[in-house]
Structure formats: C-alpha cells, structure tokens
Amino acid sequence: MKSIMVVGTTSHAGKSLLTTAICRILSRRGWRVAPFKGQNMALNAYVTASGGEIGYAQAVQAWAAGVVPWVEMNPILLKPQGDMTSQVIIKGRSVGKVSASDYYEQYFELGWRTIEESLQHLGTEFDLLVCEGAGSPAEINLKHRDLTNMRVAKYLNAPTMLVVDIDRGGAFAHVVGTLELLEPDERALIKGVVINKFRGQRSLLDPGIKWLEERTGIPVIGVIPYLQEVFSTEDSLDLLERQSSSSKAQTDLNIAVIRLPRIANFTDFDPLESESTVSVKYLSPKQDLGHPDAVIIPGTKTTIADLLLLQKSGMAEAIQHYAASGGTVLGICGGYQMLGQIIADPEGIEGQAGRFQGLNLLPIRTVITGQKIARQRQVSSNYPQQGLPVNGFEIHQGRSRIEQQGIDPQSYHALFDDINLGLVDSCQSVWGSYLHGLFDNGPWRRAWLNRLRQQRGLKSLPTGVANYREQREQILDSLATEVESHLDLTPFLS
C-alpha cells in the first residue's frame, strides 16, 4: 500500500501538525488519504461514529484528509491515569488499565497484530496513508518494543521524513544523532529531513543545510517557518507555552479554565480561544482564582484525585465562594461530576474506593463504574436559548443521577432535551454537562457568551455564526497552503 511516514527527532518536533498539513495537501491534490498513528498516548480523545475512542489529533488529521475518523486510524490509545498507569484503548474500546512496566508484556503482540489489521483495512479503502510516529524512533531503551515508528515504516516500506524542531536549538545534532542510532535498513527509508519551527532569515540557515546534506547524504526537503499551534496539542504541559505565546490584546471577557493535573479534552476550549473578544486563561489549582467572567472545570481522567486536589489547594472553596457571589461556573464531564454532591467509587475504578464530597453546586450524585459510555450525541438546547441544535460526544465512566430528596425541583433545569446530559441552576449561574465539543456549536457558544456579556453591560454578539468545524476547515486550508509552499513532497509521491 502507498504510504508516507513522518517521524521526529524528539517529542514536540511538530509531527502531528505536519501530518495534518500533508493530509490536507494531498487531499486537495485528489488523493483519497487517511492518517494513521499506531499507538498514541493522549488525554485529548474523540469518539467516532461507531462509538470508539481515538486520539483527537487523528480525528483532526482525518478531517484534514476530508474523511470521517475511524478507529483504525489510531488503533491503540493509551490514556494516562497516573504517573505509572494508563487505560488501554484498542480499536476504540477500553480493555483495562496497566502499569507502564507491564504494558508491553501484556499488549505488545496484541498491539502489533491490531496495527497490522488496521493498516490492511485502511490500505483497501484509501489511496495513500500518512503515518505519524511518536517521540523519537531512536530511543535505544524502548526500540525493541516500539510499535509506532520504524517498525511501521518497515512494514509498509514507507518513504520517511525526519522532522526536527530548530526553535529549541541543537537541530543539526538531533538529526545526525538520530540517523546514527537507526539501523541501516531503517536509515535507508529516510528520504528527507524537514527543519521545523524556523524563525529568521533563511539564507543564514543555508550553510548548515549544505553541511547536513553532505554529512548525511539525505536532502532537506523543507524548512517550515514557526507556525502558531492552531489546534490543541496532546500534552497538557503545552498549555503553558500556548498561553504564554498568546498575542490577544485587551478582551471583553476573561474565562478561567482550571488546569487539572490530568486535564482531558482541553480541545473543548479551542472554539473559545478563537473568539476575538474572549481571553482564556489556564489556572493551576494553586493559583489565585481572581475575578474572571466565568470559571470552567474541565474534563479529567482522574476525577476524584483532581477533586481532592482542588479541595486541598483551596481552589474548590474559592469556586464555591465565586458561585455564591453570582459568578458563572461550568463543569464539563469530570468537572460536571465535581459540581455535584457526591462522587462514589465503590469498586476503586479510579484508585481508592470510597465516597467523596463534591462542590455541592448542582444536585447530582455520581457513581464511577467499570463500563464506559462513549458515543456521539445530537440534542436540542433548553438553555441559554431554547431550541439550538447541539452536537458533541460523551466519554465517561461515571453515572450521575439527580438527587430529589430535599431539593426544590425549581432550583435546576435540564440543559438539553436529554436531562442526563446536563443541568443548569435556576439563576443560570452554575452549568454542568457531559458533552465534549459543546463550544464547537457556534450559536450555543455565542448565546452562552452573551449571558456573560450582559452581566458586564456589554452588547450581545450575533448568534447566527457558523459552527467551529467551518472555521477549522479554513484553518486547515491555511495551514496546508503555508506548509506546501515550504515542503517538497516529490520524493514521497514518485
């Protein structure tokens, strides 16, 4: 099957963004393209139409290719639950959790068979696969059990490009060192080097490129300028870098997102960040909450542990005081569960078994169970505006029920036409929802922001705006156009 492989000298070299751009470039040239990443470790996930989980980056790459996401595009997804354990998702379904030391003993053979099956299936449906590696292909201590890099390239006999981040320094050493550590048959697959994240005058780089090509015998096929991250990365640590590079001037609204230790699906906030009148700030639980226009508690892979940290740090109490004074609070997925009265984990699914007090801002009680819900949803809104179509997806293991005893039924309302997907209090101050992708829905997002604007005495913005996916299409086209002007794909398509 025809394929291209993209590997990097290090993590964060820009493999995902480059793979995304190549998918759109080739799609525009008439190829039927599919992305592929054999194994991904990420807490940003997407639910396919079949109800399977894949890395969100592979969903974006599929959209860039102009196709719907399939579980075969990311057959193995590892979702960290702690520093030493991960939940294992194979072909979209959770098969358990495992320690890092036991993972390869238990799943290596199954993992490779799954990767082979997925590649064969994709190969029958698409003209070309654009495959992304992970980390570095030259991690000596991990190479014998690497499922994602050169093992895939060799299986496909895929011409491979090596991407290096020049912005962090040491690019030439990274390229030469990586090539030196590859086996001869692996090195033979490297058909080009891409220098990524370049700032400055290109002519100053030319002597280095000439030396590198003479030293390695491999051409530099592209020098990509430094491009602002246009989509959320897979690593929550990059939220700090992303925020520090934000160039927004004074905005009308300031929204604080609590940066939980195991924050999941912070892709939920890309549409908010796209609003020119909104500033999104990610706050550590140890930071001062301040006086934002709204506070959002996001999803998390470890709801109870992150809830306990909020309580220990004082952030939970700060949010409770903020809500009591009329501030707007929104919880999404695990954040929604935290807003309730109780979270119970009788089987110790997340770790320590027990019952834990929530923030008591919404009348729900949640039980963590072993059976995960993962599905796409299409609903109609009741608030902040009646009848708006809302699309999104659920990924959660908790089951929440409304507490009836001692609760005024007029004190809360169903957020959507399915009450199980979220609540809002009678003051429309505290909001909670299980739906990821909520802000992707342009009219709903604007209606919610307009409530905040009204509280500030600001004029409402038009709600007749497109959904974020249309803006995402424009971003993907711009990304592809920029990358295509700096990248020669000829050696990979001949």
UniProtKB/Swiss-Prot annotation:
Residues 252-444 form the GATase cobBQ-type domain. InterPro entries: Class_I_gatase-like, CobQ/CobB/MinD/ParA_Nub-bd_dom, CobQ_GATase1, CobQ_N, CobQ_synth, GATase_3, P-loop_NTPase. PROSITE patterns: GATASE_COBBQ. It comes from the Bacteria. The active site is at C333, H436. Keywords: Cobalamin biosynthesis, Glutamine amidotransferase. GO terms for molecular function: ABC-type vitamin B12 transporter activity; catalytic activity. Pathway: Cofactor biosynthesis; adenosylcobalamin biosynthesis. One of its GO terms (biological process) is cobalamin biosynthetic process. Belongs to the CobB/CobQ family. CobQ subfamily. Catalyzes amidations at positions B, D, E, and G on adenosylcobyrinic A,C-diamide. NH(2) groups are provided by glutamine, and one molecule of ATP is hydrogenolyzed for each amidation. PANTHER family: COBYRIC ACID SYNTHASE, DETHIOBIOTIN SYNTHETASE. This is Cobyric acid synthase. It comes from Nostoc punctiforme (strain ATCC 29133 / PCC 73102).
